[in-house]
């Protein structure tokens, strides 16, 4: 199986270099500082959990490398409103174009359509992307531990925190978890999809959950389709979930979101 993450890093670094030429860091930093203040991503999730509810990070994703086009009638503002009406706590919006047909404009439009905090879902390799995310209104960014060394992860996290943003630290195995726990952000996302093979199993979350300290906020990501999947992960202490594809494919996204969030 080809190493998908390595291929992605190659084109992302080309994208970043091009973006820096088009819009220098100083200009983007000024835009980030002038942007409306971040909506508390982690705080919103904790408030949902404190009420005894599941906390759903609902994903807006047009396509994926493994499945191709997910939704033809793709309208980020409508999807954002549908997720909000269905009970989602936060939004995640794909902004990567080559693999996911995403765009920063999709995130801007989704955030403007709701009051929910928004995660920029992308492959972050450079602090420039963090500042760029805030300049476009992002409330949270993703750090994929498999994609970064410790120094890069620390620098990217520090940039996000300095801008008032939250960070979702994504892991897939014990080694990545141990590295993530050295960082400051409380949210630890366990990706049930192996980013090097794109194979998915909930056993990944079940196996790693016992090693995540209780004061951290565990997030289950990928391979989550039914209320039974949520109940299965809840049994190992995960009550926050990032779900995209299974909801994006439904005709009535609001109804599908409500159905998913019903406690088993």
UniProtKB/Swiss-Prot annotation:
Keywords: Amino-acid biosynthesis, Aromatic amino acid biosynthesis, Decarboxylase, Lyase, Tryptophan biosynthesis
Record Gene3D superfamilies: Aldolase class I
Pathway recorded for this protein: Amino-acid biosynthesis; L-tryptophan biosynthesis; L-tryptophan from chorismate: step 4/5
GO molecular-function term, one example from the UniProt record: indole-3-glycerol-phosphate synthase activity
Alphabetical list of Pfam families matching this protein: IGPS (PF00218)
InterPro entries named among the record's database cross-references: Aldolase_TIM, Indole-3-glycerol_P_synth, Indole-3-glycerol_P_synth_dom, Indole-3-GlycerolPSynthase_CS, RibuloseP-bd_barrel
Enzyme nomenclature, EC number: 4.1.1.48
GO BP terms: L-tryptophan biosynthetic process
Catalytic activity, reaction form: 1-(2-carboxyphenylamino)-1-deoxy-D-ribulose 5-phosphate + H(+) = (1S,2R)-1-C-(indol-3-yl)glycerol 3-phosphate + CO2 + H2O
Family, as annotated: Belongs to the TrpC family.
NCBIfam families: PRK00278.1-2 (NF001370), PRK00278.1-6 (NF001373), PRK00278.2-4 (NF001377)
Protein name: Indole-3-glycerol phosphate synthase
Gene: trpC
């Amino acid at each position: 199986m080809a190493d998908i993450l390595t291929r992605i890093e190659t084109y992302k670094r080309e994208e970043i270099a091009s973006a820096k030429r088009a819009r220098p860091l100083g200009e983007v930093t000024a835009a980030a500082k002038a942007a409306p203040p971040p909506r508390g991503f982690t705080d919103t999730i904790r408030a949902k959990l404190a009420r005894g509810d599941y906390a759903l990070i609902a994903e807006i994703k047009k396509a994926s490398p493994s499945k191709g086009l997910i939704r033809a009638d793709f309208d980020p503002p409508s999807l954002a409103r549908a997720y909000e009406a269905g009970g989602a706590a936060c939004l995640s919006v794909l902004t990567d174009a080559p693999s996911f047909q995403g765009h920063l404009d999709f995130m801007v439009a989704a955030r403007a359509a709701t009051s929910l905090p928004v995660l920029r879902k992308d492959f972050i390799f450079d602090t420039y992307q963090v500042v760029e995310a805030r300049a476009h209104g992002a409330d949270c960014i993703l750090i994929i531990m498999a994609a970064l060394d410790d120094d890069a992860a620390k620098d990217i996290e520090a940039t996000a925190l300095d801008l008032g943003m939250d960070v979702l630290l994504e892991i897939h195995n014990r080694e990545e978890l141990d590295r993530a726990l050295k960082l400051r952000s409380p949210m630890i996302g366990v990706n049930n999809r192996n980013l090097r093979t794109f194979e998915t199993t909930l056993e990944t979350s079940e196996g790693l959950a016992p090693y995540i300290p209780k004061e951290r906020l565990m997030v289950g990501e990928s391979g989550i389709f039914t209320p039974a999947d949520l109940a299965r992960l809840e049994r190992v202490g995960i009550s926050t979930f990032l779900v995209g594809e299974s909801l994006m494919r439904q005709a009535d996204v609001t109804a599908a979101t409500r159905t998913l969030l019903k406690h088993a």
